[in-house]
Amino acid sequence: GKLQLTIGETAVVAPSDAEVVVRVEASPINPSDLGLLLGMADVGNAQTVGEHHVEADVPEKILPALKARFDEAMPVGNEGAGVVVAAGGSAEAQTLLGKTVGVLGGAMYSEYRTLHTSQCLVMNEGVTPRESASCFVNPLTALGMVETMRREGFSALIHTAAASNLGQMLQKICIADGVDLVNIVRKPEQVQLLRDIGATPVSYTHL
């Protein structure tokens, strides 16, 4: 089997009353995006086919697990940010016109996205799309980790990817909420990175 990765063109849908059109200016690549973008293909042997097309082989033994993806176009990009350039007729939509917004809407590796106003988080004046592009996936994951800990009756967390963007967010949340957090990192310089934002303890593990 083959994974096909392409850049395509789609029409920009005119916004309904409660929708806006966002000109996307930044979008992160999260692990969840990579899973959808590349699946389990052998990207080390990927081949460029034409100007906007890449193909990579998918091992036969993996194909049954990917059956739902066969012959399906799957737009990528969970979150991003940009500027609202068109708005529907509702007061809420009109209020967003010209504003920088963070967006959770899927298919964010696009130039333009038409989205419901409820999918947009308005940024303060001066905050750039680049600074806004990761305001959903990692923050909600970090908050979810703390909430899950509490619901399951625990009072502390151990995090083994502590120096990541997610890990740094989790550290700040745990300090604010009074949650004990043990941070595990894989590079000595990452110890100081976390201590600079208040982490204690930090464990360095060489694998």
Task: List each model region and its residues.
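Rossmann-fold NAD(P)-dependent oxidoreductase module
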Residues: 169-173
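Glycine-rich NAD(P) Rossmann-fold beta1-alpha1 loop
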Residues: 161-168
